């Protein structure tokens, strides 16, 4: 997560202007909350959110019966998150949890902030209990990236570049995150192979965010586990202390 300093600098803007309100009241035009409900599902025990930011998804996770905890590299973002959930400042490539200790892990709109996302997925597989569930919700690699101009709501202009892994701060708007902190693009096969290489088995997919979707979501499981579709898994996690 190489964008720590950038997020520290924009944490207040992100909380008060980009989100526009608290985790219980902000608009959700991309349908992220519904995706969390659909793919994470009801369950018990700890749910770790990687790259939790200001903790905007905390209420949704709690409503599913789970106990949210979060990690992020940005101290500025965690300054807002602490009022919502227990947090720790940590690198997602070195999670402060024991092997096989967590029944659920969640990552929402963060993989483009993590150039080492395959390493993050390996850490997810390490900390998940057998059959544990991982929900990835992220920018759709086919329709959103430096190669896709979405400035006209009626059409998307796609330029060459989809097949090239790249990082960019180019953006069609100055109201979003990309022009402030940048974004890393991975083609869809590379992203899905990273799940498989980490030992995570995708079992469900969803898209949201418009007729040409902005968001691709995946539910995957670690090896050996519960019946698909239950949304629960054995094991309990140990939450990090607040910092």
Which residues does each PLM region occupy?
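Class I SAM-dependent methyltransferase SAM/SAH-binding core
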Residues: 48-94
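Short alpha-helix
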Residues: 181-199, 205
């Amino acid at each position: 997560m190489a964008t720590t300093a950038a997020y520290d600098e924009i944490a207040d803007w992100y909380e008060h202007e980009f989100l526009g309100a608290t985790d219980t009241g902000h608009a959700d035009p991309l349908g992220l909350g519904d995706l969390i409900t659909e793919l994470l599902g009801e369950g018990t025990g700890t749910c770790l959110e990687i790259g939790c930011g200001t903790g905007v998804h905390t209420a949704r996770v709690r409503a599913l019966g789970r106990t949210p905890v979060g990690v992020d590299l940005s101290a500025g973002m965690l300054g807002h998150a602490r009022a919502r959930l227990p947090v720790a400042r940590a690198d997602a490539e070195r999670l402060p949890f024991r092997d096989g200790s967590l029944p659920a892990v969640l990552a929402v709109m963060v993989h483009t902030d993590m150039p080492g996302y395959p390493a993050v997925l390996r850490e997810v597989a390490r900390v998940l209990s057998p059959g544990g569930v991982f929900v990835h919700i992220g920018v759709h690699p086919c329709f959103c990236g430096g190669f896709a101009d979405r400035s006209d709501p009626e059409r998307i202009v796609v330029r060459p570049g989809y097949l090239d892994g790249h990082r960019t701060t180019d953006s069609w708007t100055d109201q979003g995150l990309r022009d402030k902190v940048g974004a890393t693009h991975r083609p869809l096969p590379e992203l899905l192979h990273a799940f498989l290489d980490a030992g995570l088995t995708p079992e469900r997919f969803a898209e949201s965010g418009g007729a040409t979707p902005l968001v691709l979501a995946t539910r995957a499981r670690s090896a050996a586990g519960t019946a698909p579709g239950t949304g629960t898994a054995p094991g309990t996690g140990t939450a990090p202390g607040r910092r």
